[in-house]
Each structure stands twice: as structure tokens, then as C-alpha cells.
């Protein structure tokens, strides 16, 4: 695991050093460089496997192929045996070297053979080509930009790319619209105009002639309606067991998050089976009513883990700029940053439960909404069954009213997938200026359209597909990677194993969401392994609400930063709207607006770090430095 950076088409050793230094936190255990007149590569190493000989770059036998790499290929031992039979000679015990020899044998076709998380840059000196590639799901990030002379810069983090003085730091208006509407930026765009993500399951080839991008994998959702429940349980158990066992490979101590929820408890159960010593487990608490210590203890006791309860005390806004600095974009979810900060005090590899919801139907309310709007009588899977225990009648009716106005399933989903059921066109008239409206080139729903064109699938199954391809890689996985690597921790995600993904997307919706119960098949599978209070436990979240935050700190911070901030001064957001929300008495019915204010505060901090300075540099990241 590490951070990578580099460029193709020119030489600049000081720039390469600066790009590497910018992502030092991703790999504090070592650094390595590869340079020639065509390409320059840098690696920061967080040593996990083969601690003695695993330094990068790593080469093939004649050193005509060089690689810098971020991630883990969990099936590398199987790949190595196959390659050795074909005559390849290995000099290390790393998974990195398996990539090099796989490329020699299969070219870019090797990518489909890798089971793991990865982003890498591989230079072939014989072909004078640079190959960039990213894993199927987008677990590991990779960003790039193309300069005027057709040269290419790439890195694990955008701050490394910004070390080049010719890279423009401009806000992308479409990305800003997506961020305001969804809280994340889908697709290839980032908040920086001209700096792109390499999409999951894609590769890029840079040569002296051009830059080409290709897709080596996409999710196939062929549903097997014939599978019965018992067969599905048996297959899922076998795949889960193998996935967790593969992801136990490490030359340093490894642990697992344990919230007491279904996903982490499942991982701990299988990891304990695969380990010859007590597993290290961690449960975090923030002094909230939703702290999960009680549930985690049940699982820790059952599997006799080496369990730690970490009570995190924090000032919510104190760490806010640091979190934004590490993720290179406006975000407001601080919990992962604080969690990984605590984990790093104990170890540097940990299993996360990420992906369980996306594969097995954890977001029940979203799927209920989609089935509701797609049914002819509006009664099928009425989401009120689920939502009336979460929202007031007024909030529920507001959400349904917005969704009913949607012109397409994709537009409805764009409302549903945003945490606040989205802003509709009427609301945006008050929020956006005419300038902002004129700069938006396509609707937010356009990012979801292709996933709802799939014929022969239920609305819920189409939503599963969109969830996996859009929100998971562009929101959850970006946060997971940035916040773990900010603290030099490798987060592994067993649910996002190749075999598990393929199998779970062949399951019919009835085995994922059944009678209002999400992750039905996983609950059934674990019912004879986990205590009932865990296997039947519903999804839980943090209790801090934006409404309570608005009453305490958010109103004052928003008042300080927004009325005279970039978005108002440059006429993206209407000042009257902001002042109206700030003047109104705090009320739960205004939660959607408070969420927006919090997003805008995050944007202003991001802008103050990345766009406003005449020259990009790491600034003072104390919250006071962003307040007037």
C-alpha cells in the first residue's frame, strides 16, 4: 500500500520530489523513484507485505518494465505460480512483482486477472508507453490531467498533481452542482476543472502519439431467478470465507472494525476462523446514544478477539480543514478521519465492512422508493412501512412529493440517493443564481441514466446497479481511502472481492430485500453463527443531527463564512437564500437547508485551501484561519 505520482512526456526531478512529498502520509516507510527522458515515477511506501525486499519501483528481469503501485492483489500467489510455470523469474515475494510479470505475459489483458484493490503506473521502455490502471470497484484512487503539450501528470491524490505550476486551479461548475445536489462528484470529473479520475475498471495508455482510455471490466447483472435460498446461502458462505481468508495475508499485524453490526460481525466471524491467533478488533464511540460498544462486546466475546473500545473525544469543526486537506475535495464526514486516527495508534492494516450494503441490499428505503414509483398503483413496497419510523409525516410526504415529480427513474433516484432526498427544480430557483444555472451543462440525473435503461430488471435491481457504480466509488470509497491513508492505515474491504461481486449481482432482489428486511440472505447465512440480537439488528448510524449542530455551532460558522464567501461573491449562490436560512428560527423541518449550509461551509474551506492562494501550498489548517 502506498501513494504514487509521476508524469509522462518531460523531465523534472524537483517536481517529482515535490509530488512524492505531497503524499508522504500515504507511505511513510520509504520512497522510490524511476526516471528517464520519457517518464518519471514516484512511490511512497506503507510496508505491509515482504518488508525487506518490497521497495518500489519494481522491475521485470531485464528492467525494461517498471511499476509503482498502490494496493493489494490478494490472488498474487496463484498468479505467481502460473507465471513461474511460464518461465518468469521472481526476485521478491511481493504482489507488485506479479503485476509486472502478468503484464509481460498478457499485456493490458492482465488486468482482468487481478483480484484486489489497486492503482498503478507501469512503464514499458520497449514500447515507450505508460500504462495507468485502477481496480474494478475504485477502491484505490487515481487522478490525472493532460497539459497543453499533451504531457500527462498522475497521482494517488490531487494535491500531488497541483505541485506542477501549469496546472490550473479552477472550479468545475458541473462538479459544483453535483456536490451541492448529491454531496459528491460522480463520473470522471473532480471539483478541479481539467483534473479527472481514472474510472474504476479502466486503464489509460500514454504514448508519444496520444492518450487512450479503455475499459477492461464492467459489472454484469445477469440475474439467476432459479437459485433457491439454501443454494444461495451455501455459495455465499463459501465465497465470503475465501474472500476474508485471502485478505488476511500480511507481514504486519492486522485487525478488523467491529461495530456489532451485521457486516463487520460477519467479517470478524470468518477472520477468526482463518487466524491462528486472537483477532484484533476495534469499536469506536463518540459519546453518542448510537455508540455500539454493547453490541460489539457480544461478538468480541463469542469469537474471543483481542478487543479494544476506543472512546473518541473531539471538537467537530476543529479537525474539519485537516479532513478536507486530505481528501482534496469538500466533504463533511469527519468520523472516518477520527476513527482511522485512533486505529493508527495500534496497527496499520484493518478490515472494513464497506461494500456489504451495496452488494446485498442494505439501503432498504431507497429500493422501497424505487419500487413504489415504478408500480402502477403506488402500493407495492410502500416506503411508508420503513420511513414512518424514521421521519415525521411532513418529512415523509415531502420526500414522496418530490419523487413523484421526477420525469424518469434516474431523476427519482438522484433525489433518493442524496441524503436529504435532493433539491427539486423549484427549490433550486431560490438557491442558484442565474450565472450558476447557465453554467450547468447536464442534469444530475444524467449520471444515473444508463443504469436505469437495463431491461428486464426491477427498479430495485436497477438501483443496486446504480449504487455500486456511482455512489459507492465516488463517495464512500473515496472517503474510506483518503481518511485511512491520511493516517497511514491500509483499509481492506473483503465484501468487494471479485467472486462475491459477481455472485451477489446474480442474486434476485427477493434474496436481498425481503418483506422490508435488507441484506436478507446475509442475515439468513449468519443466523446460525451470530447471536440473534446481531443477525437481526437493523442498520444504525450516528446520532449527531444537522439540526442540533445548527443550533450549536453551524449557524455562527455559516454566518461568518457564507454571506461574503466565494460562492456568493462570484454569484453562484443567492445571498438572499443564505441570509433567510440563517435568520430563521432553528427547526427540524429545515434540516435540508442546514445540510446545504454545512456543504457550503465545506466548499468555502476547500476553496480557501486549494483555489484562493496565488500559489498552491499546504496552509495553516486550523479552523480559525478560515474564519473572518
What positions do the PLM features span?
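Short, polar/flexible loop-turn hinges at active-site or ligand-entry regions and domain interfaces
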Residues: 83-91, 108-110, 162-170, 189, ...
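Polar, surface-exposed loop/tail segments
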Residues: 94-98, 518-525, 537-547
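Short amphipathic alpha-helical segments and their helix-coil junctions
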Residues: 79-87, 443-459, 505, 571-590, ...
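Structural motif
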Residues: 87-94, 169-173, 231, 454-467, ...
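PAPS-dependent sulfotransferase catalytic core
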Residues: 530-588
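N-terminal glutamine amidotransferase
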Residues: 1-72, 101-221, 237, 241-245, ...
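ATP-dependent adenylate-handling active sites, centered on carboxylate activation for C-N bond formation
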Residues: 7-18, 37, 85, 105, ...
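Phosphate/pyrophosphate-binding loops and the adjoining catalytic core of nucleotide-dependent enzymes
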Residues: 472
Amino acid at each position: 500500500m502506498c501513494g504514487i505520482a509521476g508524469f509522462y512526456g518531460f523531465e523534472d526531478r524537483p517536481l517529482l520530489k515535490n509530488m512524492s512529498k505531497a503524499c508522504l502520509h500515504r507511505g511513510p516507510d520509504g520512497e522510490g523513484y524511476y526516471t528517464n527522458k520519457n517518464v518519471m515515477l514516484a512511490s511512497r511506501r506503507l510496508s505491509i507485505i515482504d518488508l525487506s525486499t518490497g521497495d518500489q519501483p519494481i522491475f521485470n528481469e531485464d528492467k525494461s518494465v517498471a511499476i509503482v503501485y498502490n494496493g493489494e492483489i490478494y490472488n498474487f500467489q496463484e498468479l505467481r505460480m502460473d507465471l513461474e510455470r511460464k518461465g518468469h523469474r521472481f526476485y521478491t515475494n511481493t504482489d507488485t512483482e506479479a503485476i509486472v510479470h502478468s503484464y509481460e505475459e498478457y499485456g493490458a489483458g492482465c488486468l482482468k486477472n487481478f483480484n484486489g484493490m489497486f492503482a498503478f503506473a507501469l512503464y514499458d521502455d520497449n514500447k515507450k508507453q505508460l500504462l495507468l490502471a485502477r481496480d474494478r470497484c475504485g477502491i484505490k484512487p487515481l487522478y490525472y490531467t493532460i497539459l497543453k503539450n499533451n504531457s500527462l501528470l498522475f497521482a494517488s491524490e490531487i494535491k500531488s498533481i497541483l505541485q506542477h505550476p501549469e496546472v490550473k486551479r479552477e472550479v468545475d461548475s458541473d462538479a459544483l452542482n453535483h456536490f451541492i445536489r448529491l454531496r459528491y462528484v460522480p463520473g470522471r470529473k473532480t471539483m478541479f476543472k481539467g483534473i479527472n479520475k481514472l474510472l474504476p475498471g479502466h486503464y489509460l495508455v500514454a504514448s508519444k502519439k496520444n492518450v487512450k482510455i479503455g475499459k477492461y471490466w464492467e459489472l454484469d447483472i445477469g440475474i439467476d431467478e432459479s437459485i433457491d435460498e439454501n443454494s444461495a446461502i451455501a455459495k455465499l458462505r463459501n465465497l465470503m470465507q475465501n474472500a476474508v481468508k485471502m485478505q488476511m495475508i500480511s507481514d504486519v499485524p492486522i485487525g478488523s472494525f467491529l461495530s456489532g453490526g451485521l457486516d463487520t460481525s460477519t467479517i470478524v466471524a470468518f477472520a477468526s476462523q482463518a487466524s491462528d491467533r486472537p483477532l484484533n478488533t476495534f469499536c469506536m464511540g463518540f459519546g453518542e446514544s448510537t455508540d455500539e460498544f454493547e453490541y460489539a462486546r457480544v461478538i468480541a466475546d463469542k469469537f474471543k478477539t483481542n478487543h479494544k473500545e476506543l472512546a473518541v473525544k473531539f471538537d467537530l469543526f476543529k479537525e474539519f480543514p485537516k479532513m478536507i486537506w486530505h481528501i482534496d475535495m469538500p466533504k463533511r464526514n469527519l468520523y472516518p478521519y477520527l476513527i482511522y486516527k485512533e486505529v493508527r495508534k495500534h496497527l496499520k492494516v484493518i478490515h472494513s465492512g464497506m461494500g456489504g450494503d451495496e452488494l446485498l441490499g442494505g439501503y432498504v428505503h431507497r429500493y422501497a422508493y424505487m419500487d413504489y414509483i415504478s408500480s402502477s398503483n403506488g402500493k407495492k413496497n410502500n416506503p411508508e412501512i420503513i420511513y414512518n419510523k424514521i421521519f415525521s409525516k411532513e418529512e415523509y410526504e415531502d420526500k414522496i412529493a418530490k419523487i413523484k415529480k421526477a420525469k424518469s427513474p434516474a431523476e427519482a433516484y438522484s433525489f433518493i440517493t442524496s441524503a436529504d432526498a435532493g433539491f427539486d427544480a423549484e427549490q433550486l430557483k431560490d438557491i442558484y443564481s442565474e450565472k450558476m444555472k447557465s453554467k450547468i451543462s447536464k442534469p444530475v440525473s444524467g449520471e444515473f441514466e444508463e443504469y436505469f435503461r437495463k431491461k428486464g430488471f426491477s427498479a430495485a435491481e436497477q438501483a443496486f446497479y446504480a449504487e455500486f457504480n456511482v455512489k459507492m466509488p465516488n463517495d464512500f470509497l473515496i472517503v474510506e481511502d483518503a481518511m485511512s491513508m491520511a493516517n497511514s492505515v491500509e483499509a481492506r474491504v473483503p465484501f468487494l472481492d471479485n467472486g462475491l461481486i459477481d455472485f451477489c449481482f446474480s442474486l434476485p432482489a427477493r434474496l436481498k430485500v425481503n418483506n422490508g428486511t435488507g441484506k436478507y440472505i446475509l442475515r439468513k447465512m449468519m443466523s446460525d453463527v451470530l447471536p440473534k440480537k446481531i443477525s437481526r439488528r437493523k442498520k444504525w448510524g450516528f446520532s449527531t443531527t444537522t439540526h442540533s449542530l445548527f443550533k450549536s455551532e453551524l449557524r455562527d460558522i455559516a454566518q461568518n463564512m457564507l454571506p461574503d464567501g466565494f460562492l456568493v461573491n462570484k454569484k453562484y449562490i443567492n445571498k438572499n437564500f443564505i441570509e433567510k436560512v440563517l435568520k430563521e428560527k432553528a427547526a427540524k423541518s429545515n434540516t435540508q437547508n442546514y445540510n446545504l449550509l454545512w456543504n457550503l461551509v465545506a466548499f468555502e474551506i476547500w476553496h480557501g485551501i486549494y483555489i484562493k492562494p496565488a500559489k498552491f501550498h499546504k496552509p495553516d489548517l486550523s479552523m480559525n484561519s478560515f474564519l473572518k
